[in-house]
């Protein structure tokens, strides 16, 4: 949400602790309830990283998952968003991060001062200056290497949909090729990489007054299918 936490830490693309805690609480309170999880953008990266980290336990708690518009490779994504038309998205995203960092610095004066934060002009620079040191990474390169979900995909044991558009301004298309190769070796991964859809958009249809929302339907259909399959397996004599 938009409300900042009160801790010195922010959130980041590899922070799976909050998700793990939420899933643990849900499964304790509703142990027999089927559970599906969907994550979008940064949340999708966190979800996939969690599923890979918890490969031995995740499938006992989660029926299915869906990750949308995921920045699978954070290093390549940070370079890509700093080029061409994608820089417009970087500015919007970066301005939001800088506002949050300055607000956080008012609570924790040891964090980088506002003037230094305001001088940041790229996402990679922000991660070098703020994200990495605040969260215990050596630098942005270390943060990207340890937090990118692409390195965890082969470990996933929960049936998971990966929905990304080829024209996503946050990720170079060649990364999706690498993800596709990994998915071919993991039967739990289903990829859907349409040419168009932008970043978490996927709006289509010929009539602008009656748009077709592909994202919601695709994710809903996938999760419903997995729930139905799980229900059938549980009711077999």
Question: What label would you give each PLM region?
Answer:
Residues 197-212:
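Catalytic histidine-centered segment of alpha/beta-hydrolase-like enzymes
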Residues 1-10, 202-203:
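Glycine-rich "HGGG/HGxG" loop immediately N-terminal to the catalytic nucleophile
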Residues 150, 166-169, 176, 196-198:
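Acidic beta-to-alpha connecting loop that harbors the catalytic carboxylate
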Residues 129-152:
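Active-site nucleophile elbow and catalytic-triad environment of alpha/beta-hydrolase enzymes
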Residues 156, 162-164:
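Short beta-strand/loop motif that positions the catalytic acidic residue
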Residues 172-189, 194:
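Conserved loop-alpha-helix segment in the C-terminal half of the alpha/beta-hydrolase fold
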Residues 9-30:
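Alpha/beta-hydrolase active-site loop
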Residues 30-134:
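Alpha/beta-hydrolase-fold enzymes
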